[in-house]
């Protein structure tokens, strides 16, 4: 079984690429979704978040206060790293469990999709890495429409991620998301065949 880490900045199209890889037969572990689940459901993670960022990190109904946490995390240097230090070890444990299940079930390609793959050390948990990059103006337009946030908020999040140039340097494969959806589908298929050898 091959493990592939897929990353890219906010709005780059990495989740779309992973969807195309799933169509080819890959299994995808969505690290960002797992992190959100852990922040909501894992008692140790919740307690550490409250200790680090205050009780306002959760609403009275016990749901995560995403707006408050985003303001806390993206508003001051070092706080993103603090949150990641709480959540990422648990995400990696979940990925290792997913890897064992996938191997037992005969999966040929397991994809680890993560916005902060390199920053969190996730590249050490996979065989091959791929980065999805896209023009900044397109990324900002997509995210503001998708998440109902301002362009300034998107840029603030971008500052906490590797630049596209750094991603190009560090990744084994780079997918340029600068064309149509069909272009991205074709590039995703090419990536699939390159990393699996057609298996």
Swiss-Prot record:
Its main location: cytoplasm. GO terms for molecular function: ATP binding; dephospho-CoA kinase activity. The keyword Nucleotide-binding applies. It comes from the Bacteria. Keywords: ATP-binding, Coenzyme A biosynthesis, Cytoplasm, Kinase, Nucleotide-binding, Transferase. Belongs to the CoaE family. Catalyzes the phosphorylation of the 3'-hydroxyl group of dephosphocoenzyme A to form coenzyme A. This is Dephospho-CoA kinase. It comes from Salinibacter ruber (strain DSM 13855 / M31).
């Amino acid at each position: 079984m091959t493990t592939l880490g897929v990353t890219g900045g906010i709005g780059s199209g990495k989740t779309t690429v992973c969807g195309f890889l799933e169509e080819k037969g890959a299994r995808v572990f969505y690290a960002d979704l797992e992190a959100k689940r852990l922040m909501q459901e894992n008692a140790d993670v919740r307690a550490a978040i409250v200790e680090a960022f205050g009780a306002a990190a959760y609403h009275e109904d016990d749901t995560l206060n995403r707006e408050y946490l985003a303001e806390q995390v993206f508003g001051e240097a070092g706080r993103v790293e603090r949150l990641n230090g709480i959540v990422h070890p648990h995400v990696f444990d979940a990925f290792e469990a997913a890897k064992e299940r996938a191997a037992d079930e005969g999966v040929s390609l397991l994809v680890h999709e993560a916005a902060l793959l390199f920053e969190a050390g996730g590249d050490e948990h996979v065989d091959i890495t791929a980065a999805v990059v896209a023009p900044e103006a397109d990324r900002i337009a997509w995210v503001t429409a998708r998440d109902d946030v301002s362009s300034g908020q998107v840029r603030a999040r971008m500052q906490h991620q590797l630049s596209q140039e750094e991603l190009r340097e560090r990744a084994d494969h780079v997918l340029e998301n600068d064309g149509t959806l069909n272009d991205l589908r074709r590039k995703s298929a090419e990536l699939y065949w390159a990393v699996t050898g057609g298996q």
